Amino acid sequence: MRKVFLAGNWKMHYTSVEAADVAKQIVDGVYNINNNVVVMVTPTFTSLCKVCRVTKGTNVLLGAQNMSYENSGARTSEIAPSMLLEFGVDYVILGHSECRTYLGENDEIINKKVLTGLKHPFKYLILCVGETLEEREKGKTLDVVLNQVRNGLASVYESDLQRIILAYEPVWAIGTGKTATKEEAQEVHKAIRLEIQSLYSKSAADNIIIQYGGSVNVDNVEGLMGENDIDGALIGGASLKADSFLKIINKISK
């Protein structure tokens, strides 16, 4: 049975003091959580130091929102994997739609980051994939998403998949208040799992974690998580307040 991974992505919100306060509330709120649920928080780079002090030694994993595929060098504004590990980072989000859109990251760059991340002792790498509204309306959803999966996992060995989490996040549902229906999400998640089976093996497909991201909240999370191939959520706005994030967590872990 696959575990449920619930990751809060705080994007460009909170000072380090504010982030640490929210993290402390979450840590306290999940002290006795069901072992089948994994809770993750992803603050800004500048908050990692303070949040690390809160999450260290707890059952809440600490993540980073991106990283360079280089380990050092002339990469102004970027951050290296080793720098993240200094702050106890457990996982890194890669290929988020906002990074693809605003930072110009393409499949080749994202694949380089995946391969670099696998050379470092992160527990997990979250590889995000998803289609735009225009691509969905043209019936290209599966073509786009599965191509991103193939490109993102290029040269990744099956033995490394235990450290890979895939996150399907339809771009049109990110921060818009819109969300895919549970049936729409399940259709894509199932296709992704079948693609993993084709690329690797049935065992790999059965075991890989596939999250859904896109305006997830306390009202829709239970329905989404009830689908066979949805193993968690990458949660934006609803994770910014500890009480709303905890409501989501408690709804799934009950």
UniProtKB/Swiss-Prot annotation:
Residues involved in substrate binding: 9-11, 175, 215, 236-237
Subcellular localization: Cytoplasm
Keywords: Cytoplasm, Gluconeogenesis, Glycolysis, Isomerase
Pathway where it operates: Carbohydrate biosynthesis; gluconeogenesis; Carbohydrate degradation; glycolysis; D-glyceraldehyde 3-phosphate from glycerone phosphate: step 1/1
Domain of life: Bacteria
Annotated InterPro entries: Aldolase_TIM, TIM_sf, TrioseP_Isoase_bac/euk, Triosephosphate_isomerase, Triosephosphate_isomerase_AS
Gene Ontology cellular component annotations, sorted alphabetically: cytosol
Keyword Cytoplasm tagged: yes
Catalysed reactions, as listed in the record: D-glyceraldehyde 3-phosphate = dihydroxyacetone phosphate
Keyword Cytoplasm: yes
Entry's Gene Ontology molecular function annotations: triose-phosphate isomerase activity
Catalytic residues of the enzyme: 96 (electrophile), 169 (proton acceptor)
NCBIfam families: tim (TIGR00419)
Record's subunit section: Homodimer.
Record HAMAP family: TIM_B (MF_00147_B)
Family named by the database record: Belongs to the triosephosphate isomerase family.
Name this protein carries in UniProt: Triosephosphate isomerase
Native source species: Borrelia duttonii (strain Ly)
